[in-house]
């Protein structure tokens, strides 16, 4: 049976450009990276996190002042992988705008709200979901206690990040994240996860700038 990832990659369109040195072919994602657009799609895990972090650092090296756009469609995933992306977004000098297409759940919602001020967007039919971290561990009783304390520490840290970027109180965030909380784009805007819901790009805007 063929690897589904290999099958998918074989379907990625190629873009051919004419240059002074002849034709040059890019896969569609590499071509959009030239426009400073990063796609964060699928589960957040170590491999995907490494690629996104590398792209952020590359675009900063190219131009430390020019905006980077991140398009998010993710069900979430591993907390530490997501925090690696989050920390890099805050670390680099270029402002990072975020745009939710499809869904931004769990760590996806945290990365969505972590965009630069007034540069966090959602398409009208996107869905956003926030909740507390989950996990499981087997082993000695003492080790289980240590891991339980660690997940509580992670929960507290994630709550603090949401507080920072949404403007909500810690209590409001804690209550909202107690269970899976599903939000429409408008509800996410009212909650402070995004700044604006957009349904059409202005004619003068470039692909890297949603509004």
UniProtKB/Swiss-Prot annotation:
CDD domains given in the database record? S14_ClpP_2 (cd07017)
Q: Which residues form the active site?
A: 106, 131
Indicate yes or no for the key word Glycoprotein. Answer: no
Sorted alphabetically, the keyword list is: Cytoplasm, Hydrolase, Protease, Serine protease
- Catalysed conversion reaction: Hydrolysis of proteins to small peptides in the presence of ATP and magnesium. alpha-casein is the usual test substrate. In the absence of ATP, only oligopeptides shorter than five residues are hydrolyzed (such as succinyl-Leu-Tyr-|-NHMec, and Leu-Tyr-Leu-|-Tyr-Trp, in which cleavage of the -Tyr-|-Leu- and -Tyr-|-Trp bonds also occurs)
Could you mention a single GO BP entry for this protein?
protein quality control for misfolded or incompletely synthesized proteins
Q: Where in the cell is it found?
A: Cytoplasm
Q: Which InterPro entries match?
A: ClpP, ClpP/crotonase-like_dom_sf, ClpP/TepA, ClpP_His_AS
EC numbers: 3.4.21.92
Q: Does the keyword Electron transport apply?
A: no
Q: What is its main location?
A: cytoplasm
Assigned GO CC terms: cytoplasm; endopeptidase Clp complex
Q: Which GO terms describe its molecular function?
A: ATP-dependent peptidase activity; ATPase binding; serine-type endopeptidase activity
Q: What does this protein do?
A: Cleaves peptides in various proteins in a process that requires ATP hydrolysis. Has a chymotrypsin-like activity. Plays a major role in the degradation of misfolded proteins.
Quaternary structure (record): Fourteen ClpP subunits assemble into 2 heptameric rings which stack back to back to give a disk-like structure with a central cavity, resembling the structure of eukaryotic proteasomes.
**Family, as annotated:** Belongs to the peptidase S14 family.
Q: What is this protein called?
A: ATP-dependent Clp protease proteolytic subunit
> What does the organism's lineage look like at the top?
Bacteria, Pseudomonadati, Pseudomonadota, Alphaproteobacteria, Hyphomicrobiales
